[in-house]
Regions:
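Hydrophobic membrane-targeting alpha-helices
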Residues: 22, 26-31
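Peripheral interaction segments used for macromolecular assembly
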Residues: 2-18, 31-259
Length: 259
């Protein structure tokens, strides 16, 4: 699907301090409520060194490729197709959203299946679930979701909330578009695949073709844990912020990513 094609001949990262020890972020500048808000707390921000980070193509799968695949019941009967994937604040897959598409005699309905109850075929062409016509009412969309989680509470989120989002570099530099998410076989979000904007060029003036892979930065990287430091992404954010400057990605080569 993709392979690590980063250049091996690179100089020291501009982020050497944060890569080695992390940046201890304190005293966030923001609303007055930050001092007493339980969500405003000290956060240690660590950026992963892109020149040593590797994404093993044998250990992950593409969210985009799983969306739209057939969903089968325990006896191999058609149930519908994969409509969306739900992640938790911990970056792990929590549920699969299934569109019945008229199967099971329900018309067009969406069902939620716990990821622990889902089996993905080795070739990722279909998934098997426990859903049957008799058990369908067990898979309501809102089962297990609290009625009110509060405005600052961390929450589950849909893959479609991040795929298609804009990507910024440090300094609010416009950079790219989120193309895909890569999940480990254990169900943990590993990486974000991005497509640079046609107007984004490297330091030598060349333009960035192809796709690039970056570590996933979600809850715990600034957003939702304080004010004044915008790193990573939380559901509802206007864009996905990478903790890298333009100089930090100049030497990176594209991933061999198959659409």
């Amino acid at each position: 699907m993709f392979s690590n094609l980063h250049s091996s001949s690179v100089g020291p990262s501009v982020l050497s301090v944060s890569l080695a020890t992390g940046i201890l972020v304190t005293g966030f500048a923001g609303p007055a409520m930050a001092a007493t808000d339980p969500a405003a707390k000290t956060v240690e921000i660590k950026a992963i060194d892109l020149h040593t980070w590797k994404l093993d193509p044998a250990t992950g799968w593409s969210v985009r490729k799983l969306i739209g695949k057939k969903v089968k019941g325990p006896k191999g009967e058609n149930v519908g197709e994969v409509d969306n994937i739900i992640f938790g604040p911990d970056g792990k897959v929590h549920e699969l959203i299934v569109s019945t598409g008229g199967f099971l005699g329900l018309g067009e309905k969406n069902l939620a299946v716990k990821w622990a109850d889902v089996t993905v075929s080795p070739d990722y062409k279909f998934v098997t679930t426990p859903i049957t016509a008799a058990s369908v009412k067990k898979y309501g969309l809102f089962d297990g979701i609290p009625k009110s989680s509060g405005p600052l509470a961390e929450r589950d989120w849909r893959s479609s909330e991040l795929i298609g989002d804009y990507v910024y570099l440090k300094g609010n530099l416009h950079y790219a578009y989120v193309r895909d998410l890569i999940v480990s076989k254990g169900g943990e979000l590993q990486a974000v695949i991005v497509s640079p904007d046609v107007g984004f060029s490297h330091g030598d003036g060349s333009y960035s073709g192809g796709y690039y892979a970056y570590p996933y930065y979600g809850y715990g990287y600034g957003y939702g844990h304080g004010y004044g430091h915008e790193v990573g992404w939380n559901p509802g954010n206007a864009h996905y912020n990478l903790p890298y400057a333009k100089a930090d990605i100049t030497d990176l080569l594209p991933y061999a990513y198959r659409k």
